[in-house]
Amino acid sequence: MQLPMQLSESARTSKHDVISCWRLGEQIIGGRWYNIFRAAPKTVSPNADHDFVIKVINPELPPDLIALAIDRLGREAHATERIIQSNVIRLLDAELDQAPFFLVQPWVKGRSLDKLLSRAPYLSLSRMLWVLRQTAEGVRAGHENGRVHLGIDPAHVLIGKSGRVSLIGWSQSHLIDEPTWLPQNQLQLARYTAPECFAEDYRAAKASDVYSLGAMIYHVLALRPPFQGQTIQDLEHCHLNEIPEDLIVIQPDCPTRLASLVKQMLIKNPMARPSFREVLNELISIEIEYLSDPTLIRL
């Protein structure tokens, strides 16, 4: 596929009311790389609910990043088309061959995990374990399809009103053992990135998702990521050299088994971490143990 190095005015899709067969509603996210809108099929009434989201390239993105933005959009589309699992967001439509480039997914009625952590006064331990286990199920489904997520972070965990998790953020994903191009300017992502990912010769590996999920679980319990660096270089140094504060010290209500699991997941050497299957099995076991536990985690 020949990728354009810049977007024409006709491809600056954030100014359009209609893209392909989709009518755009309100913009819900405006990021450096992409804009995301509520959407509905243009064949239905303009007053119909916008039960879908459409993701398009930010028209203000510098021309030298357009090819990479299309590649990332394609990675997300290919991953969410192939991974059929209830905790992975589904692809409904996409255009990757010509402008305007886009993908369409269901609208999840609920909130992301990062919003939940910032707004809720507390979270029940049993519900938290349910959310974490579902997230792990989504990541494992990617692994079973030969794909490493490489973008695990609380903003990519959507929690529907029923409590069902939908894992998004697959634009960072790579095939297992594929050389990666992880962006070097994403500070938020770097807070959860495994130390080996910073190497120039890094190839995508499931062990990196083990670390990132461990970092996210740490954040859920400690209300902050394992490391507080203010630059990517600071975070790289921390991931490579520093040991995070003990979870039990920060959050005394954390189950001992969960704190121990997270500690193992955050081991610097990827070969010494538990396998993702071992992580998931332990999360399931902990979830069952605390299924009726009334403990509330203060947020």
Show the residue positions of the predicted features:
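AlphaC helix of the eukaryotic protein kinase fold
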Residues: P63-R82
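Protein kinase catalytic-loop region centered on the HRD/HxD motif
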Residues: E137-R147
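Activation segment signature within eukaryotic-like protein kinase domains
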Residues: V131-L132
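Conserved activation segment of eukaryotic-like protein kinases, specifically the C-terminal portion
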Residues: P183-E196
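Activation-segment/catalytic-loop signature of the eukaryotic protein kinase fold
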Residues: A94
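Structural helix C-cap motif within protein kinase domains
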Residues: A222-P226
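Conserved short submotifs of the Hanks-type protein kinase catalytic core
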Residues: Q98-S112, L116
